[in-house]
Design a protein with these regions (language model features):
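Extracellular, repeat-based ectodomains that mediate carbohydrate processing or recognition
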Residues: 1-222
């Protein structure tokens, strides 16, 4: 019955903030906001580690640090949040960020994003959480062209397997997807596949926890 919302707080200098919510029946209550980045913060995306109670990661664009792609570990206790140190996953202009933990490997997650400092390619990196610190492996390109609205999800039935869905700007704005496989901190990708031969916006992906290798992509068909 606990969840976290991460956001840009425009009433607090655009700082990145997060808050714990508690569900009781059909009612919600919230704790106090806790700032995770005391500078202009865009595209915050939060994901919990399903293997570690109360542990989550926020990935975001840190405008106050040259728009680098950055992530931080948070730990929930009651309705309070404590954070570790920030870790950079892309020393370049990053946006359209999504992240997901591997349900089969504690402390392991993937972050996907558009790397504006590398021709706006769709890019991914593996993060490893140890305590309240994050280390990242190398960056891996899954689409050597402009990739918007990137979203990733792991298959909970297959360790290390995930899907990325995105808008392929150089392919008429079509919706494309690709399978990634994690081994340690390296990622290998399969071929890309079109799931919508039309203008595609805001794709999201979810895997069926009861059926291996099955997932659904929802999107705006514009």
């Amino acid at each position: 019955n606990k969840f976290v919302i991460a956001y840009q707080d425009s009433d607090n200098s655009n700082y990145g903030g997060a808050i714990v919510g508690t569900i009781s029946g059909t009612t919600l209550s919230f704790g106090s906001e806790v700032v995770f980045n005391s500078s202009d913060t865009y595209n915050p995306f939060v994901t919990f580690d399903p293997n570690t109670a109360g542990k989550f990661v926020v990935a975001y664009k840190d405008v106050g640090n040259s728009s680098y792609g950055t992530a931080i570990v948070g730990a929930v206790s009651g309705t309070t949040i404590t954070y570790g140190s920030e870790s950079v996953f892309n020393s370049g202009n990053s946006a359209e960020i999504s992240a997901a933990f591997d349900p089969n490997t504690a402390g392991k997650f993937v972050v996907v994003y558009v790397d504006y400092s590398n021709s706006s390619y769709g890019t991914a990196a593996v993060g490893t959480v140890s305590g309240t610190t994050i280390s990242f492996g190398s960056e891996y390109v899954y689409n050597s062209a402009t990739s918007y609205y990137n979203y990733c999800a792991f298959d909970p039935n297959t360790a290390g397997k995930f899907v990325v869905a995105y808008r392929a700007e150089s392919n008429s704005g079509y919706g494309e997807s690709v399978v990634g496989t994690v081994s340690g901190t390296t990622i290998s990708f399969g071929s890309t596949y079109v799931f919508n031969s039309g203008q595609t916006y805001y794709p999201s992906v979810s895997s069926d926890p009861n059926t291996a290798n099955k997932f659904v992509i929802a999107y705006k068909d514009g």
